[in-house]
UniProtKB/Swiss-Prot annotation:
Subcellular location: Cell membrane
UniProt similarity note: Belongs to the aromatic acid exporter ArAE (TC 2.A.85) family.
Domain of life assignment: Bacteria
Residues spanning the membrane: 53-73, 90-110, 114-134, 178-198, 421-441, 457-477, 491-511, 532-552
Protein name stated in the entry: Uncharacterized transporter GOX0755
One annotated Gene Ontology cellular component of this protein: plasma membrane
A GO term, aspect molecular function: transmembrane transporter activity
Keywords: Cell membrane, Membrane, Transmembrane, Transmembrane helix, Transport
Membrane topology annotation: Multi-pass membrane protein
InterPro entries (alphabetical): PHBA_efflux_AaeB/fusaric-R
Length: 739
């Protein structure tokens, strides 16, 4: 039976349900409007009142474009105090840079339109390039990048307004700076009135952030310890949560002030959870090897599992952190004692000696797992009770990608220059307004990895603003002559935008709506916005966003396959640098960089088939673990207790691994063979070694080498740089082998 027949029979049986399905679904989608979250409804009301106050003061001061004061309030206002202050600080910085740059541009090129457009485009591109280098993720919530965005569009509005009247550029720029500063000061001041008990609430939020991340991580590790299938299925969500919460720690630091280093400790604790997961993945790899598990290991694994599962409840209670750390230290000592007792027991044959070695490697992995958890808990305790003379610092890491920065810069510069050519060639009277909107869009979105999608959502919000402003200007406020009427109707429209901003699926369209609505309303002391002014503003707005969206799709568009290839090349190059000994990498830097790659790939996967994304995610995690074990081997090579023969074997594997240098010269096969040869030589060294300390060092080296060899073998297609990884020509069997 066809789908059409099934639909007809269903409609005949229950026609009322079919009719009501559409309206019910629509009503549920509008729940953000008629049943909003009370906290976010308060945010929308507070920001609306602040915006109207800024607009009223700007009108009272008789500023030339008072709508920018109201617009700035909506640009700076965020759901939390920390976000608002962080964004306000960087917005103010960007405004100062943009004003100075705009004055310089107009003063240098007052009567050369083509050169003016060229330098305007170069300036926007430069700000985008600098923004790409800012620490943190390339997202709309990164307010360091927002500082460069603010520089870009302030540079544009000052220079575009000033080029029409270059003799008064200083007065124009001071006017623009005044209403932007007015909006920032009002929003920061009024939002502070509603933040009672902020410090206590923020410290509680930092604690809950850590606990909410640690609990699923410990649950996954507990599954690994008992050999549960699919125990690490939710590791992707945990890494994404670590990245998101790590970004939010910065705003908690702003709310707490710079009196202590609680935020630094919280950021380090979240990073240690990522290290904990990496150690758990190493343990899972070793547990799959033959002769690795015995009854004693299973008993210890069960004891550690029980400890991990009970840990979240113990953190929520009043139990001291010292007792928890003492229990973990006891478990660690038991693992060490098990290895020492095996050292003192004579083994009857080589098979028994091999089994003892495997057990020792598992015990070493358990020790490293416990150490990672102890480090995370220590940092968590320091974030809850920071010391008075604490100088600990865990910075937000940034990874400069020159290729991405140049791409972002060219994309924005060419788009702005093209808009300028359209204005020069057509002599459009509203051409400067058109260029201004294009500059705003390029400044906001060119630092994102997928600007076309963001611009599309921005266009929808702008269209809603056009409709709302049309109703206000042409119908509701057509005859109003008082600020009270203006405030009543525009405040109602702004309130709707504030409620939409609090609803995640509508956040970006709501930003556009709140940004452009005051511009389209165009309040002024001298005149009202009639239909001519309204359409001459709305048309450049819509056309500017359409043009920018089109340019993002045709000029240097986002290519997910290229991003995956680039990530893979960088991972192979990092392996080369770490093995070569030239990279000044640490465990935290390796984990944070690869977790960032992991989350970026998940975020930007788009319509890519799930098996391809899953295989790349597995490859990134595998590469991260190989890097961590290479760092450990580098440390072991510097240990004076390592005998010369073992040191020579490690030097050989490092030399081979250093050939992972790019796309076409992988030397994968020789590297894998060298790794297995080094394992055999170190096993011989361990078999001939009687001193316990030296045997511990050899077992640690063998643990790392076994993990590296297993990862190289399991993810052959990812690490073999000569292969076209996940090319459409690959067979399903080859694709499955990558996972």
């Amino acid at each position: 039976m066809s789908d059409a027949c099934i639909y007809c029979k269903t409609a005949q049986r229950c026609p009322s349900d079919m009719i009501q399905a559409g309206p019910v679904a629509l009503i549920r989608k509008l729940r953000w409007l008629y049943a909003p979250d009370p906290v976010m409804a308060g945010y929308a009301l507070r920001t609306t009142c602040t915006s109207l106050l800024a607009l009223g003061i700007a009108l009272w001061m008789e500023l030339g474009s008072p709508q920018w004061a109201a617009l700035t309030v909506w640009m700076v206002a965020q759901g939390t105090r920390g976000r608002s202050l962080a964004k306000a600080k960087w917005h103010l910085f960007g405004m100062v840079v943009g004003v100075i740059s705009g004055i310089t541009l107009v003063a240098a090129i007052p009567q050369a339109p083509l050169m003016f457009i060229l330098l305007l485009a170069v300036g926007i591109g430069t700000f985008c390039m600098i923004g790409t280098f800012m620490p943190g993720p390339a997202s709309m919530t990164n307010y360091r990048i927002h500082g460069m965005r603010a520089s870009g569009f302030t540079y544009a509005i000052v220079s575009l307004d000033g080029i029409a009247d270059p003799h008064h550029i200083f007065a124009i720029s001071m006017s623009r700076a005044t209403y932007i500063l007015l909006g920032i000061v009002l929003e920061a001041s009024i939002s502070g009135l509603f933040q009672l008990g902020l410090t206590k609430r923020t410290r509680h939020q930092l604690a809950s952030t850590f606990e909410d991340t640690l609990k699923p991580a410990l649950t996954a590790i507990a599954g690994i310890l008992v050999g549960k299938e699919g125990a690490m299925q939710n590791v992707q969500a945990i890494f994404a949560q670590i990245t998101t919460l790590g970004d939010q720690v910065e705003f908690a630091e702003v709310e707490l002030g710079r009196h202590d280093h609680a935020g630094d400790h919280a950021r380090a604790a979240l990073a240690d959870i990522a290290v904990l997961l990496a150690r758990a993945l190493d343990l899972a790899t070793l547990m799959r090897l033959p002769l690795s598990q015995d009854d004693m290991f299973r008993q210890e694994a069960e004891a550690i599992r029980d400890m991990f599962l009970k840990l979240p409840a113990r953190l929520e209670e009043t139990e001291s952190m010292a007792s928890i750390l003492a229990d973990l230290l006891t478990l660690r000592r038991q693992c060490r004692q098990k290895v020492v007792s095996d050292f003192s027991t004579a083994q009857p044959d080589d098979a028994a000696r091999e089994a003892v070695l495997r057990h020792g490697m598992l015990q070493q992995a358990l020790v490293e797992l416990i150490d990672a958890l102890r480090m995370a808990l220590t940092q968590f305790e320091a974030s809850r009770h920071p010391g008075s003379h604490d100088h600990f610092h865990s910075p937000i890491r940034s990874y400069r990608d020159w290729q991405q920065a140049i791409t972002n810069s060219l994309r924005s510069s060419v788009t702005v220059f093209g808009a300028g050519l359209i204005w020069i060639c057509t002599a459009w009277p509203s051409g400067l307004t058109f260029i201004m909107f294009v500059c705003i869009v390029c400044s906001l979105f060119s630092t994102l990895e997928r600007p076309a999608l963001a611009t599309q959502a921005f266009l929808r919000g702008a269209c809603c603003a056009v409709v709302a402003a049309g109703i206000l200007n042409l119908a509701l406020m057509g005859k109003s002559t008082t600020f009270e009427m203006l405030g009543m109707w525009s405040g109602l429209a702004m309130m709707i935008g504030g409620l939409a901003f609090a609803y995640p699926p509508l956040t970006l369209p709501a930003v556009s709506y709140n940004l452009f609505l005051p511009i389209l309303i165009g309040p002024s002391n001298q005149a009202k916005t009639d239909e001519i002014v309204y359409f001459n503003t709305a048309l450049p707005l819509v056309l500017g966003l359409l043009y920018a969206s089109w340019m993002y799709r045709v000029f240097l568009p986002y290519d997910p396959a290229h991003q995956r290839w680039t990530m893979r090349e960088h991972i192979l190059r990092d392996l080369h640098r770490i093995a070569d000994g030239r990279a000044q990498e640490t465990v935290d830097s390796v984990v944070s960089r690869n977790v960032d790659r992991f989350v970026r790939l998940m975020t930007n996967s788009g319509s890519t088939p799930s098996p391809v994304i899953q295989a790349y995610l597995t490859g990134i995690l595998s590469g991260m673990r190989v890097m961590l074990n290479l760092l450990r081997l580098q440390a072991i090579r510097r240990d004076t207790r390592l005998n010369p023969e073992a040191g020579q074997a490690l030097a050989l594997i490092m030399g081979r691994m250093s050939h992972f240098s790019g796309r076409y010269h992988g030397h994968y096969g020789r590297t894998l063979r060298a790794t297995k040869l080094a394992i055999l030589r170190l096993r011989t060294c361990e078999r001939n070694e009687d001193r316990p300390r030296e045997r511990f060092v050899l077992i640690a080296a063998l643990t790392s080498l076994d993990v590296i060899a297993t990862e190289l073998d399991t993810n052959r297609i990812f690490f073999d740089a000569r292969s076209p990884y996940l090319d459409p020509s690959l067979t399903p069997a080859e694709l499955e082998s990558t996972g």
